[in-house]
Amino acid sequence: MKIVVCDDDEKFLKEFKTVLQERLTSLEIEAELTMYSTGKKLVEVCEQEEIDVLFLDIDMPEVDGFKIAESVRKKELNCLIVFCSNYSDFVFKSFRYEPFSFLCKENYQEQLSDVMKRIYEKWNSRKKEFTYQIKGGGVRIKQRDILYIDTSNHKIFIHTIPFIQNNKKL
């Protein structure tokens, strides 16, 4: 699981990384953690890499957490977003970006284990794959990418999200 954390407060970022690593270890979850102190750099990374979980501060200079979340949603990237902020006023505004959760910085440590358990369950369910054989070998498709399966003239057609988006054959 690839987890990215973005917060402009270097002290909080360091503390959050330590606490998150402790929670991941206690829950026996293997993850790759990457930390960013600016939203600008993270936006570039989101375009190039697949990220499973984003922990985002909201109030940051240049590019705030909402702009990052908006960019992620527009690109239809399939990552879970968790906002982490000092301002509980942002909770309702955050719904616009379909977050997985919202953590208040003042008591995030109490909630983090539960949030990570739920994230792990969701992430595990997304990893499931459908495998089938064709001439020349096997093919794997992520179940979450399958829209529907139909048949015609004794042939099976699997319609997937990438097929619809890119209009390419598998």
Question: Could you say what each language-model-derived stretch is?
Answer:
Residues 41-125:
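CheY-like receiver
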Residues 21-29, 162-165:
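Alpha-helix termini
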Residues 114-170:
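Conserved binding/recognition cores within well-folded domains
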Residues 24-37, 45:
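Short hydrophobic/Thr-rich beta-strand motif most characteristic of the beta2 strand and flanking loop
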Residues 10, 37-41:
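Acidic phosphotransfer microenvironment of two-component signaling modules
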Residues 36, 103, 132:
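Hydrophobic residues at beta-strand termini and immediately following loops
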Residues 1-20, 54:
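Conserved acidic segment of CheY-like receiver
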